[in-house]
Amino acid sequence: MIAFLSGRVVSRGAETAVIDVGGVGMTVHCTPAALARLRVGEEATVATALVVREDSLTLFGFADDDERDTFERLQTASGVGPRLALAMLSVHTPDALRRAIATEDTAALTRVPGIGKKGAQRIVLELKGKLGEPGGDTAATPEQSAAAAPRNWRAQVVSGLVNLGWSTREAEAAADAVAAEAGEQPDVAALLRSALRRLSRA
């Protein structure tokens, strides 16, 4: 497993970053929290997970080990692959996901595009006790989450849409279209749903 990458950030997009590691440009599919920490031209270290498929090798990047570990544990539930796990971390922090599983809050899980009521119930059933207890030291506080939301909502919406199969260009256009709905404290899940409705009508 490639546990982390360290190098200069060459570029940063809506859901990916390219990091120069010893002269090799590594494309990393990142959570919004990971992307928010990267600055083009600066050195960075990103926690990573390598997903191997018959026809591809894909690196996923995270803000810290907690995000990466949560990403990997989410995939132990049936029907949850890398893209859906990344979408879950685009909407919720790891601690919010732990809390949702521990309290059987299926409504919180259905805020993630691609998860319906039955899927949320299955995820709760299969992951109960596997994500750890909520309230860990690495979790963002409600105040931190609220402060981050105005800055990061667009990246989260774009990342969520791309993870659901839309192109980066389509996702960015949809995010721009719902920007007027954001307000001072954006509801990322509501903005994602609104963007999805616009894309479905297009």
Swiss-Prot record:
Question: Region annotation Flexible linker: residue ranges?
Answer: 143-152
Give the GO molecular function terms: ATP binding; four-way junction DNA binding; four-way junction helicase activity
Q: What is known of its domains?
A: Has three domains with a flexible linker between the domains II and III and assumes an 'L' shape. Domain III is highly mobile and contacts RuvB.
Name the species this protein comes from.
Thermobifida fusca (strain YX)
Q: Which InterPro entries match?
A: DNA_helicase_Holl-junc_RuvA_I (IPR013849), Hlx-hairpin-Hlx_DNA-bd_motif (IPR003583), NA-bd_OB-fold (IPR012340), RuvA (IPR000085), RuvA_2-like (IPR010994), RuvA_C (IPR011114), RuvA_C_sf (IPR036267)
Question: Which gene specifies this protein's sequence?
Answer: ruvA
Name the chain's protein: Holliday junction branch migration complex subunit RuvA
Note the subunit structure.
Homotetramer. Forms an RuvA(8)-RuvB(12)-Holliday junction (HJ) complex. HJ DNA is sandwiched between 2 RuvA tetramers; dsDNA enters through RuvA and exits via RuvB. An RuvB hexamer assembles on each DNA strand where it exits the tetramer. Each RuvB hexamer is contacted by two RuvA subunits (via domain III) on 2 adjacent RuvB subunits; this complex drives branch migration. In the full resolvosome a probable DNA-RuvA(4)-RuvB(12)-RuvC(2) complex forms which resolves the HJ.
**Which keywords does UniProt give here?**
Cytoplasm, DNA damage, DNA recombination, DNA repair, DNA-binding
Q: Where is this region: Domain III?
A: 152-202
